Amino acid sequence: MIQQESRLRVADNTGAREILCIRVLGGSTRRFAGIGDVIVATVKEATPGGNVKAGEVVKAVIVRAKKETRRPDGSYIKFDENAAVLIKNDNEPRGTRIFGPVARELRDKKFMKIVSLAPEVI
């Protein structure tokens, strides 16, 4: 459950460490975002020498969320942190590596490149 002003960790090697959600994409009344949803965010913390700088506005897809997500078989999945991966306008990841596990729901939402780069899909 990510909403405006939520802070997320960045799970890729673009140079951003933390982002702040400024808009959940998908309609003017859309309040919350879950795993696999795209958000617009600003970079709050970045490593020196990275591809993105602090203050830059980026698009990101949520790969881990603390709020549990129900699966079609009735099971639930939740993570210890909220994390996102920065993406380009064509939904391809901006980084070349993904850190930590990602949810299987990304495959259903057509983020195949992120799923293939991830070390573990849960």
Swiss-Prot record:
Keyword rRNA-binding attributed: yes
Record key words, sorted: Ribonucleoprotein, Ribosomal protein, RNA-binding, rRNA-binding
Keyword Ribonucleoprotein included in the entry's annotation: yes
CDD domains: Ribosomal_uL14
SMART domains: Ribosomal_L14
A GO CC term assigned to this protein in UniProt: cytosolic large ribosomal subunit
InterPro entries registered for this protein in UniProt: Ribosomal_uL14 (IPR000218), Ribosomal_uL14_bac-type (IPR005745), Ribosomal_uL14_CS (IPR019972), Ribosomal_uL14_sf (IPR036853)
Pfam name, any one: Ribosomal_L14
Alphabetical GO biological process terms: translation
GO MF, one annotated term: structural constituent of ribosome
Chain's role: Binds to 23S rRNA. Forms part of two intersubunit bridges in the 70S ribosome.
Complexes and interactors: Part of the 50S ribosomal subunit. Forms a cluster with proteins L3 and L19. In the 70S ribosome, L14 and L19 interact and together make contacts with the 16S rRNA in bridges B5 and B8.
Family: Belongs to the universal ribosomal protein uL14 family.
The protein's name: Large ribosomal subunit protein uL14
Encoding gene per record: rplN
